[in-house]
From Swiss-Prot:
This is FERRY endosomal RAB5 effector complex subunit 3. It is found in: Cytoplasm; Early endosome. The keyword Phosphoprotein applies. The modification Phosphoserine is found at S79. It comes from Rattus norvegicus.
Length: 552
């Protein structure tokens, strides 16, 4: 049967088409390889173009070609079926095995024989995890997750050491070659060595990438199976080993933590908190925080698990499947990847700990790329239709051409979302596209970055995100042109716009209390921080404090 299929796949037949131009009779002969994988319409178009055929035979040629392909394909299918039957008759194929295969396929594809639809694994696991994290087993879950995190961190450390050694060795080799350049070696030798070094680095990075991917996949499977098993054991009141199973990991972890004796020292953060009221008729109360911190500090796990760190992690886990999610805004460029800048740093943090609930960051970005490509293609086709109908002016034409030219990227003000369960204090990341215009001092409330913030806050209202962290100055790092007046103008603009958006939110969600965290870069001075802190009560209506005194 395989031999017949091989002959069938390599078979060629000649398509003959006769037509007449005036008194001259012509004949077109084209060899076709069967089976024909190409669409008949595409093949017909190629024939018309390649042989410069007249347009009046176009439809007739198309019908003749489609008919020829259909007839010859049916003939090949019939001969292939005959060969299969002969193989069954001759005993080359086991009849009973073939019958069981057909019966299984029929039962799986026919509704009356199909099994009842099983519950979705992800939904089951989410429900089970939500039950366990709100039970006495929560500490066990967190410690197991932390042990997995330490394991991956050690693996990443080994990778970094090996890559560093390779780069140092390659640097020494390149220095020696450069010393001989022009003497015994040429530019071609240098380029050849550089290419070898690049290939060696790529091979080593791919090796470690595959190892990390495999390790995280194993961890995820083990963790999910263990969670399901623990949940089943909790339902069995007669299981005497259950309490020991829950207790063993915390005690082991505390011993290892005490043995390590490491104290995590992070850069001192500046922080101010405010309680504000918005609205005149429908009053809503919200919490605002101004922080001097790195945006990724909300994502990073600590190698040692102090009480404060553990409480943050517990709170994040408790609210993972709740209506009180936490999000942050990352300012990124227009390319949907994790190759540079804060995108690369964020992806590195995500890779340090296995995500047991959602796909890896790379898989989520691949899905976003496909969605963005589809959306941009749809937008491009609509722009083309509008241009063809003559309803667009020159400026719109230029804008649509620009969209066509960059249809694989997103535009300033657009954003994409990734979901995470493996970050310290964050469930959702909004990747907001901005351009170099945010570094200028003349942006307005209609700037794409500002409108992007508005749309992000709207998503927060409709998707149960009650805490959102926003870069106040719309930058993650300070530069020379960002003077004190620049910072004050930018902060005032963002404060006022966010205030307006939060007042809009009252009509979107009914006035749910939310927490908005405004972050400024760590390199900003204390004096500048306190100037921004003094500005906030001038824009938002801060709740007045009430001082209680006792009478003696």
């Amino acid at each position: 049967m395989k031999k017949n299929r091989e002959r069938f796949s390599s078979k060629e037949r000649e398509f003959v088409y006769k037509f007449q131009i005036g008194s001259e009779r012509l004949e077109l002969r084209v060899p076709l390889r069967f089976p024909v994988d190409e669409n008949a319409s595409h093949l017909h178009g190629r024939l018309m173009l390649l042989h410069s055929l007249p347009c009046f035979i176009e439809n007739d040629l198309k019908e003749a070609l489609a008919r020829f392909i259909e007839e010859e394909s049916l003939r090949d299918h019939d001969s292939d079926a005959e060969a299969c039957l002969e193989a069954v008759k001759s005993g080359e194929v086991d009849l009973h095995q073939l019958a069981s295969t057909w019966a299984k396929a029929y039962a799986e594809t026919t509704l009356e024989h199909a099994r009842p639809e099983e519950p979705n694994w992800d939904e089951d696991f989410a429900d089970v995890y939500h039950d366990l994290i709100h039970s006495p087993a929560s500490e066990t879950l967190l410690n197991l997750e932390h042990n997995y995190f330490v394991s991956i961190s050690e693996l990443i450390g080994e990778r970094d050491v090996e890559l560093k050694k390779l780069r140092e060795r390659q640097g020494i080799e390149m220095e020696k070659v450069m010393q001989e350049l022009g003497k015994s070696l040429t530019d071609q030798d240098v380029n050849s060595l550089a290419a070898q070094h690049f290939e060696s680095q790529q091979d080593l990075e791919n090796k470690w990438s595959n190892e990390l991917k495999q390790s995280t996949a194993i961890q995820k499977q083990e963790y999910q199976e263990w969670v399901i098993k623990l949940h089943q054991d909790l339902k069995n009141p007669n299981n005497s080993s259950l309490s020991e199973e829950i207790k063993v990991q915390p005690s082991q972890f505390r011993e290892s933590a005490d043995a390590a004796g490491r104290i995590y020292e992070e850069q001192r953060k500046l922080e101010e908190s405010f309680t504000i009221h918005l609205g005149a008729q429908l009053k809503t109360m919200h919490n605002l925080r101004l922080l001097r911190a790195d945006m990724l500090d909300f994502c990073k796990h600590k190698r040692t698990q102090g009480s404060g760190v553990k409480l943050h992690r517990l709170q994040t886990a408790l609210s993972l499947y709740s209506t009180s999610l936490c999000g942050l805004v990352l300012l990124v460029d227009n390319r949907i990847n994790s190759y540079s800048g804060i995108k690369r740093d964020f992806a590195t943090v995500c890779q340090e700990c296995t995500d047991f609930h959602f796909p890896r960051i790379e898989e989520q970005l691949e899905v976003v790329q496909q969605v963005a490509l589809y959306a941009r293609t749809q937008r491009r086709s609509k722009c083309k239709e509008a241009r063809d109908s003559g309803n667009q002016n020159g400026g719109s034409d230029e804008k649509s051409k620009n969209a066509e030219r960059n249809y694989l990227n997103i535009l300033p003000g657009e954003f994409y979302i990734t979901r995470h369960s493996n970050l310290s204090e964050i469930h959702v990341a909004f990747h907001l596209c901005v351009d170099d215009n945010v570094k200028s001092g003349n942006i307005t409330a209609r700037d794409p970055a500002i409108m992007g913030l508005r749309n992000i806050l709207k998503v927060c209202c409709t998707h149960d995100i009650t805490t959102i962290s926003i870069p106040l100055l719309l930058v993650h790092d300070m530069s020379e042109e960002m003077t004190i007046p620049w910072c004050l103008r930018r902060a005032e603009l963002v404060f006022k716009c966010v205030k307006g958006f939060m007042m809009e939110m009252a009509s979107w969600d009914g006035g749910i209390s939310r927490t908005v965290q405004f972050l400024v870069p760590q390199s900003i001075s204390e004096e500048m921080f306190y100037q921004l802190s003094n500005m906030l009560p001038q824009i938002f209506r801060v709740s007045s404090t009430l001082t209680l005194t006792s009478k003696h």
